[in-house]
């Protein structure tokens, strides 16, 4: 099987062009000028007879066997109109390059960064349908093409093999022209994909773009709590009071209610103070059984009036005032099932940037990383699709919560959120994560956090066949390989 493919490589150092051409032996390679990139490529594609075209803007070469891999892949995926792959970077002192793994097609992530990389194949038919590269967007032509393709292509495919090898890590440093072009490209994309706003364009290629909330729907914040004071580090505190007070004082979104499921041991003065803090937003639900987080959440959902339910632990402290807007805007996406937040431990390290399921392991993305750790491919900095999120802070459309059956009471303390996420994606819904909803989470300060073997047996008994799900986070133990 041969692949009908034409590469267009930007003119640069003659040796770099020569190295790439040698690595692409068997395919047509045409050199184009950066100054007239769009015009040169569009004219060349118009004259081309290749089935696929690829513009290479980077110093690197195809990995050995890359063309054969691409050929096999497109023959196995004849409907693919966009194909991109993992990459590799040579590391000084090491024989093998380091792999730069990428997620599968992630539309919300794409509006925040052009993560496709240097090797992106477009079917010539799609390239022509899109009108080719836009000459009015110098410095952002390739990103703009990917954004436009994402709105019309029904098959954007990822090859989880490093087919492009760079001699050094790619460093993105957009000049003023490229920043302006990127802004215009993203403005057009957001307008065509449901709306949104651009907070900032990053010269490093990471852009703060956000969806916008439609209307002002009621959010029911469901908080299971014992409702008592406890001593932590020698100080008596009541976590649910602190959590509710922080939300009331800091949140910029105000159409919410607190559905607080309180144990029978709840202190009367705590209940009274909750009423004082939350006023008519406070809904008290009584709980008279042994601890079961799942059952308490489900009971709270029965009493919830909101169009959306926010599952929330009582041992949290809000950081970002606009957290509800950031989560709600994603929860309003057409196929949204759940949205998670960025959680930090009290020592400022990351606790949660999404769930990662890898090689039969379920764990938190970013666990124990430094507060400002950007994550592999800047994954801690961008809104993105994920395989799951923690129920310590998760927003769901109420209808979806009930459709999936809520949380299973067979998992009273652990892995109930894993099960909930699995059920949500099993029914075809998308799960998102945002770094713009930030909270401290004082991990299980008010309950026994031990994991029981029965919980492992139940969760893995149900979902072990899906406990390797590297689509959106392709890193073992949620760390990049290296």
Go through the PLM ranges and name each one.
Residues 53, 309:
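Short aromatic/hydrophobic "clamp" motif used to bind/position activated sugar donors
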Residues 147-166, 187-200, 210-211, 409-412, ...:
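Catalytic donor-sugar/metal-binding loop of nucleotide-sugar-dependent glycosyltransferases
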Residues 1, 176-219, 347, 359-386, ...:
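C-terminal, non-catalytic tails of nucleotide-sugar-dependent glycosyltransferases
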Residues 65-97, 169, 316, 320-360:
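Conserved donor NDP-sugar-binding/catalytic core segment of glycosyltransferases
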Residues 19-31, 240-255:
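Short, acidic, metal-binding catalytic loop of nucleotide-sugar glycosyltransferases
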Residues 35-48, 287-304:
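Glycine-rich, basic loop-to-helix element that forms the pyrophosphate-binding segment
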Residues 131-147, 317, 383-440, 446-449:
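Donor nucleotide-sugar recognition loop
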Residues 96-125, 295-296, 358-399:
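A recurrent flexible, glycine/aromatic-enriched loop bordering the glycosyltransferase active site
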């Amino acid at each position: 099987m041969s692949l009908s493919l034409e590469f267009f490589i930007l003119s640069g150092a003659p040796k770099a062009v020569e190295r790439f051409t040698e690595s692409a032996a068997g395919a047509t390679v045409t050199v184009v000028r950066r100054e007239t990139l769009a015009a040169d490529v569009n004219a060349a594609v118009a004259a081309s007879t290749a089935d696929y075209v690829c513009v290479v803007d980077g110093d690197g070469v195809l990995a050995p066997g890359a063309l054969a891999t691409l050929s096999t892949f497109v023959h196995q995926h004849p409907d693919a109109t966009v194909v991109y792959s993992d990459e590799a970077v040579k590391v000084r002192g090491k024989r093998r390059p380091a792999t730069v793994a990428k997620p599968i097609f992630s539309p919300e992530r794409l509006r925040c960064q052009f993560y496709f990389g240097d090797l992106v194949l477009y079917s010539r038919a799609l390239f022509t349908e899109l009108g080719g590269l836009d000459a009015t967007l110098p410095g952002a032509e390739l990103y703009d093409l990917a954004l436009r393709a994402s709105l019309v292509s029904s098959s954007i495919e990822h090859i989880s093999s490093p087919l492009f090898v760079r001699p050094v890590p790619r460093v993105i440093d957009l000049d003023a022209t490229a920043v302006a072009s990127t802004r215009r490209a993203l403005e057009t994309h957001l307008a065509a994909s449901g709306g949104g706003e651009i907070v900032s364009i990053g010269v490093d290629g990471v852009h703060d773009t956000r969806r916008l909330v439609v209307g002002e729907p009621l959010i029911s914040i469901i908080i299971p709590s014992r409702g008592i004071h406890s001593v932590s580090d020698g100080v008596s505190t009541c976590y649910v009071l602190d959590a509710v007070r922080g939300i009331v004082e800091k949140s910029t979104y105000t159409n919410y209610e607190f559905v607080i499921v309180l144990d029978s041991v709840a202190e009367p003065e705590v209940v009274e103070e909750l009423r004082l803090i939350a006023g008519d937003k406070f809904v008290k639900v009584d709980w008279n059984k042994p601890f079961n987080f799942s059952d308490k959440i489900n009971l709270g959902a029965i009493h919830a009036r909101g169009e959306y339910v926010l599952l929330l632990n009582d041992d949290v402290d809000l950081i970002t005032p606009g957290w509800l807007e950031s989560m709600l805007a994603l929860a309003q996406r057409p196929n949204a099932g759940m949205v998670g937040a960025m959680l930090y431990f009290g020592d400022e390290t990351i606790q949660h940037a999404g769930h990662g399921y890898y090689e039969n392991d379920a764990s938190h993305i970013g666990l124990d990383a430094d507060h400002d750790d950007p994550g592999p491919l800047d994954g801690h900095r961008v809104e993105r699709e994920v395989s799951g999120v923690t129920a310590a802070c998760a927003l769901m459309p109420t209808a979806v919560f009930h459709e999936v059956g809520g949380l299973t009471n067979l998992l009273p303390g652990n892995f109930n959120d894993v099960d909930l996420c699995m059920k949500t994606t099993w029914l075809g819904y998308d799960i998102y994560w945002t770094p713009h909803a930030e909270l401290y989470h004082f991990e299980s300060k008010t309950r026994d956090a031990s994991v029981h073997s029965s919980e492992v047996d139940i969760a893995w008994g149900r979902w072990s066949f899906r406990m390797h799900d590297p689509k959106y986070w392709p890193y073992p133990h949620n760390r990049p390989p290296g």
